[in-house]
């Protein structure tokens, strides 16, 4: 019998490009920026396998920079799965989503990148 393949429970950091335009296509104007934050949380939860997702203040500011009606079409984010140090925490890991640097040539063709941490 084969072993059950589960998500590896380790600390890891990855960079993703999220296409928010596709996720917010049929959304009302006055709900676009809040829905963008919810979609980023949902994406990080799916990719990292953690229920506890924390969004950085800078990422929140960038989403809301053009108001409630104009979130960016695509955004480059860095998602880090970290160990939860709280004793009364429900889960062992949490995800921290921050904004990543955008290269001068744009977002096309970047793909997913694993970041090596210097600890």
UniProtKB/Swiss-Prot annotation:
One matching Pfam family: Ribosomal_L31e
UniProt-listed GO biological process terms: translation
Sorted UniProt keywords: Ribonucleoprotein, Ribosomal protein
Domain of life from the UniProt record: Eukaryota
Molecular function (Gene Ontology), one example: mRNA binding
Gene3D superfamilies: 3.10.440.10
A Gene Ontology term for the protein's cellular component: cytosolic large ribosomal subunit
Stored InterPro entries: Ribosomal_eL31, Ribosomal_eL31_CS, Ribosomal_eL31_dom_sf
UniProt-listed SMART domains: Ribosomal_L31e (SM01380)
Coiled-coil features, chain-numbered ranges: none
PANTHER family: 60S RIBOSOMAL PROTEIN L31 (PTHR10956), LARGE RIBOSOMAL SUBUNIT PROTEIN EL31X-RELATED (PTHR10956:SF52)
Family: Belongs to the eukaryotic ribosomal protein eL31 family.
Name of the protein described by the UniProt record: Large ribosomal subunit protein eL31y
Native organism: Arabidopsis thaliana
Gene from which this protein is expressed: RPL31B
